[in-house]
Amino acid sequence: MVVKKPRPKKKPVTKKVAPAPLAVKKPVVKKVVNQLFEKRPKNFGIGQNVQPKRDLSRFVRWPKYIRVQRQKAVLQKRLKVPPPIHQFSQTLDKTTAVKLFKLLEKYRPESPLAKKLRLKKIAEAKAKGKDVEPKKKPSYVSAGTNTVTKLIEQKKAQLVVIAHDVDPLELVLFLPALCRKMGVPYCIVKGKARLGRLVRRKTCTTLALTTVDNNDKANFGKVLEAVKTNFNERHEEIRRHWGGGILGSKSLARISKLERAKARELAQKQG
């Protein structure tokens, strides 16, 4: 019987693409190194070269007031914050706040200089023998916790504005509940310093508007509506909403590591 020899397999022929006719290799220019200049690499080890400039703010010994405010901010994130305190972190939105402060600007208390000039004019008129008619007292914003509390209790306040960063917070902690009880619209805004500027002081905890001019009643009505929907009508939601309880990056990493270890153990037991 004749045994057939296996035929050798043909090798696949790969076609080479012809090079582009105008492709010319660029000559490599060698960098001329001056032998006079010796390379001296820096060593940034301990006790060696001067260290390069880095951001060392993490290692700065900050003043005590900065350390305290940072620790306070961290604690407020970590600890569980009860609703009466947590509500002070939810402030009035920017657009409504701008409208509100524009309105309050018109009812700033009289400056000492303006008062002096007004009284001087009245005195001069009286000295000349003219009859000075008593003008209607202009409506100003009322400031201070005690004054505002009295106005709320008497139901004279039309709007109460509370600062969110009062320290200690106990000074104004009861005001939102009192406003809700007496049916007075209230809002929490950013900055005791901003309120203080309105009443010509450094800081101010609370303001209250008792009367508004007829020209501003339309704008005041819109602001009141926004304030009521954001604060007074959201009472039940605010009452249930706790704050804080946010873990730091290290704690989260530790928890995730433990969970991974537990998952690995379970997999080994089942496998």
UniProtKB/Swiss-Prot annotation:
Any single biological process term in GO: cytoplasmic translation
Source organism superkingdom: Eukaryota
Keywords: Ribonucleoprotein, Ribosomal protein
GO cellular component terms, A-Z: cytosolic large ribosomal subunit; cytosolic ribosome
InterPro entries found in the cross-reference section: eL8/uL1-like (IPR050257), Ribosomal_eL30-like_sf (IPR029064), Ribosomal_eL8-like_CS (IPR004037), Ribosomal_eL8/eL30/eS12/Gad45 (IPR004038), Ribosomal_eL8/Nhp2 (IPR018492), Ribosomal_eL8_euk (IPR001921)
A Pfam family this chain is assigned to: Ribosomal_L7Ae
KW Ribonucleoprotein (keyword) present: yes
Gene Ontology molecular function, alphabetical: RNA binding; structural constituent of ribosome
Family: Belongs to the eukaryotic ribosomal protein eL8 family.
The protein, known as: Large ribosomal subunit protein eL8
Organism: Drosophila melanogaster (Fruit fly)
